[in-house]
Amino acid sequence: MESPAWDATKNDSLPPTLTPAVPPYVKLGLTTVYTIFYLLLFAFVYVQLWLVLHYKHKRFSYQTVFLFLCLLWASLRAVLFSFYFRNFVEANRLGAFTFWLLYCFPVCLQFFTLTLMNLYFARVIYKAKSKYLPELIKYRLPLYLAFLVISLLFLVVNLTCAILVKTDYAETKVIVSIRVAINDTLFVLCAVSLSVCLYKISKMSLAGVYLESKGSSVCQVTCIGVTVILLYTSRACYNLVVLSLSDSRYSSFDYDWYNVSDQADLKCKLGDAGYVVFGIILFIWELFPTSLVVYFFRVRNSAQDMTNPGMVPGFNPRSYFFDNPRRYDSDDDLAWNITPQSLQGSFGPDYFDWGNRNSFGSQTGSLQRDST
């Protein structure tokens, strides 16, 4: 668990700014705690994916994609911290691909979950407005392509920088600066986009009815979304601020790497105190927001959703959605009376699915038959 001695003849990079200052039992205890937390999250997500099969939900949906990304993220973080039980030196001398996989790729997975949250809440808005704005359907494909391109850009930048930073002739400071600038700018932009979606949802009572029919609520969505936005934005802003500081300034942070909240790739090795701070920051800025996302997309029993206490007794989710008196609480919902035959999409009964295309006319017809 001790940091190896510095040998200036073997490495031209800057020497560590820290000396071992944390007792070995403290580091061992923290490593155990970190690993247990990640393993617990891994086990919980694994159970959720099995429940998808048990309750016969759709196997390819927003829910399953989110859960799979979180499962992969938790497994990579657990493997990384397991190195620090006996292989502390190996954890700081990884090859280019292994370094990218354990240190960089989990950050990419978190960005992917943020983009998927944007797409999911944008879909909720589309569902609520597609009745009187059917032309919105033509913007769905460009929106998906835009977020796909952004995600690929994020992935390529991280992979390229991770490979370059491991080369002997690389300008590590420049490479890390470019990566941090691009990554955190994209994080901030996606966070702003998500905040706009949440604001629109909070102003549309019909979107709230849809979320309630899925076992959630506008209040729950807003709380989780705002928390994730604040955590990711604060992390990105911190990284950008540190990026703007001079060498003398960020050395005074007493961290043995440059981008303390992201990856340990500017200086040669993590120091003892730096390792402690690294784990704590990952817990606050990674484990906590990821756990919130997992909680929101957890698997619910379809039978329990049908008897949700928020539903009007005697109505199923579909009739509750169309008959709910709160749908006229806002100007957006009043517009649903304008063109009752123009709806091109509707809220399907499948949980967190990619989309159903049942017509509004068929649903209103069935409701009229039920009323007669």
From Swiss-Prot:
Sorted alphabetically, the Gene Ontology BP terms of this entry are: autophagy; negative regulation of bone resorption; negative regulation of osteoclast differentiation; positive regulation of protein localization to lysosome; positive regulation of TORC1 signaling; regulation of autophagy
| Membrane-side (Cytoplasmic) residue stretches | 54-64, 115-144, 195-222, 298-372
Tell me which UniProt keywords the record has, alphabetically.
Autophagy, Glycoprotein, Lysosome, Membrane, Transmembrane, Transmembrane helix
Coiled-coil parts of chain: none
Q: Which residues cross the membrane?
A: 33-53, 65-85, 94-114, 145-165, 174-194, 223-243, 277-297
| Localization (cell) | Lysosome membrane
Q: Does the keyword Signal apply?
A: no
Residue ranges in the Lumenal topological domain are: 1-32, 86-93, 166-173, 244-276
Quote the InterPro entries the UniProt record gives. GPR137 (IPR029723)
* Keyword Nuclease attached: no
According to its record, how does it sit in the membrane? Multi-pass membrane protein
Task: List, alphabetically, the GO terms of the cellular component aspect.
Answer: lysosomal membrane
The glycosylation sites annotated in the UniProt record are: N11, N259
| Family according to the record | Belongs to the GPR137 family.
Reported function:
Lysosomal integral membrane protein that regulates the localization and activity of mTORC1, a signaling complex promoting cell growth in response to growth factors, energy levels, and amino acids. Interacts with Rag GTPases and increases the lysosomial localization and activity of Rag GTPases and thereby regulates mTORC1 translocation and activity in lysosome. Involved in the regulation of lysosomal morphology and autophagy. Also acts as a negative regulator of osteoclast activity.
Listed PANTHER family: INTEGRAL MEMBRANE PROTEIN GPR137, INTEGRAL MEMBRANE PROTEIN GPR137B
Q: Mind telling me what this protein is named?
A: Integral membrane protein GPR137B
What is the source species?
Answer: Xenopus laevis (African clawed frog)
